[in-house]
Amino acid sequence: MNKLALYCRIGFEKEVAAEITDTAAERGVFGFARIQENAGYVIFECYQPGEADRLAREIPFTQLIFARQLVVVSDLLQNLPTTDRITPILQKYQEVSPHLKLQQSSELWVETADTNEAKELSAFCRKFTVPLRQALKKQGWLNFKQIKDSGMTLHCLFVRSDACYAGYSYNRNHSPYFMGIPRLKFPTEAPSRSTLKLEEAILTFIPREEESKRLNENMIGVDLGACPGGWTYQLVKRGLFVYAVDHGKMAASLHETGRIEHCSEDGFKFQPPKRKKADWLVCDMVEQPGRIVALIGKWLSNEWCHETIFNLKLPMKKRYTEVRRCLQKLADELTQSGLKFRMQAKHLYHDREEITVHVRTWRH
């Protein structure tokens, strides 16, 4: 098993390929990406044995922008007999078991890519999971009961009913969600579906145990381009008082909470009220990414807030290059301002032609 499978949104295979190629090269690992347009995944094949496993351990999954999941995989197992698909899969795992501690595996995910064609396999995958899990357990695998983060998950990525990649991921360095997709339910009281973007961002960027410390009723938030209030809703739900900045109308349900002040202003010109620095800034404005980065840089450099989640709308071409350029520009500005910071960006499931960025700053 010397390949990586990286799941993604369809149409972003080239960005995933460019990112994993660059990230691997930074660690002295070289290979080539196999891209199939609109496949919903990319296969990165390493030149040297053992390097896919090394990348799966060493590349911080949280620093990959466009990948939803990171899995070490076998060659594609093709022409699996319909009467016995399990034996060839078991054989692949048995080949690597001498130098891989499969006894530390805790879960099995039989998955497909997130495409309409692949989803037709989802019913098959659910049914196949049970007998495959039983067969793997008979080998002494999938019984790991210790701290989940220290084990591994076994994956079978089916591309057809008779073809799959068998592999594994490290629990401490992967997406904890099946297919790399968090299943969020749209709250009926939210003003717009965009609310799911911020909910997923909070889930992705802020550890669950820290959420109540980092987002609570003692804090002030600013939402630039707030109308009708999908993102404001997520902050208000967590107790923040929010300055909702937009010329458009906010949902009446948010006014009724008493936790917002609607500022009918241009988001690019708004500044926080004097002596009331915001704790949080959120922004989901449809604007060129360069302008948004300059705006966020101004807020953070002036210390008008110390934590932010914002979206960057991507151009039609050279999306990966533009993302790298924008994030580097923001990082340079924060460094020149003498701020320490942590920055993370992700192409979330609820994002489309955009990525979501989280930045937290401090002085010491």
UniProtKB/Swiss-Prot annotation:
GO terms for molecular function: S-adenosylmethionine-dependent methyltransferase activity. S-adenosyl-L-methionine binds at residues 194, 227-230, 246, 266, 284. The keyword Oxidoreductase does not apply. It catalyses: cytidine(2498) in 23S rRNA + S-adenosyl-L-methionine = 2'-O-methylcytidine(2498) in 23S rRNA + S-adenosyl-L-homocysteine + H(+). Keywords: Cytoplasm, Methyltransferase, rRNA processing, S-adenosyl-L-methionine, Transferase. Its main location: cytoplasm. InterPro entries: RlmM_FDX (IPR040739), RlmM_THUMP-like (IPR048646), RNA_MeTrfase_FtsJ_dom (IPR002877), rRNA_MeTrfase_M (IPR011224), SAM-dependent_MTases_sf (IPR029063). The active site is at residue 313. GO terms for cellular component: cytoplasm. Its EC number is 2.1.1.186. Transmembrane segments: none annotated. It is found in: Cytoplasm. GO terms for biological process: methylation; rRNA processing. Catalyzes the 2'-O-methylation at nucleotide C2498 in 23S rRNA. Belongs to the class I-like SAM-binding methyltransferase superfamily. RNA methyltransferase RlmE family. RlmM subfamily. Monomer. This is Ribosomal RNA large subunit methyltransferase M. It comes from Actinobacillus succinogenes (strain ATCC 55618 / DSM 22257 / CCUG 43843 / 130Z). The gene is rlmM.
